[in-house]
Structures are given as structure tokens and as C-alpha cells.
Amino acid sequence: MKIEIQKDPDPKRLEELGVRAWPIWEKEISEFPWHYDEPETCYFLEGDVIVTPQGGEPVRVRKGDLVTFPQGMSCTWKVRRPVRKHYRFG
């Protein structure tokens, strides 16, 4: 399962997706397991995270990244700088 990351996506793309209308999620510096029951697309407003999929290689996600996490993926999040992101499931 692959995490898709678009670094500094075009503002027009973010507008097309309606990112500003998505809810916001925030998390302090921490480490925790997570499982995606459905796909999630999110846009990082702040933060620095290492996401390590079960059986996979760590991926770094930072402010300005548009990320899609696949359905069915289990992983560990290591929040290195507090996160603030818009998100959408499905």
C-alpha cells in the first residue's frame, strides 16, 4: 500500500478539491498506531510527521503536502512537530 504525496500542490488544485471546506484535525507531538478503514486525503497546514506503514518504509509528511492514505493501511504516526491539517475520508 502506497502513501501518495504531492509536495506544494497548485493552489488551483486545492480549490478544485474544496480543501478549505474540509474539517481540521490537530495533534500534539506524539507517537501512535493508526488504521485507515477508508481512504483519507489531507492537506498539511502545519507539522512534521513520519508515517511508517506496517511492513513498509517510513514516509515524511510536512507543511504544504497534499497526502492520500490508502484504505486498509495500518501504520504508526510519529508527530515531530504539532500537526494541523484539513482532511477528507472516502
What is each of the regions a protein language model found here?
Residues 71-90:
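Ligand-binding loop in jelly-roll beta-barrel domains
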Residues 55-71:
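Short acidic-glycine-tyrosine-enriched beta hairpin
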Residues 34, 51, 85-87:
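Short hydrophobic/aromatic-rich beta-strand segments that constitute the beta-sheet cores
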Residues 8-10, 18-37, 70-71:
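Conserved short histidine dyad/triad with adjacent acidic residue
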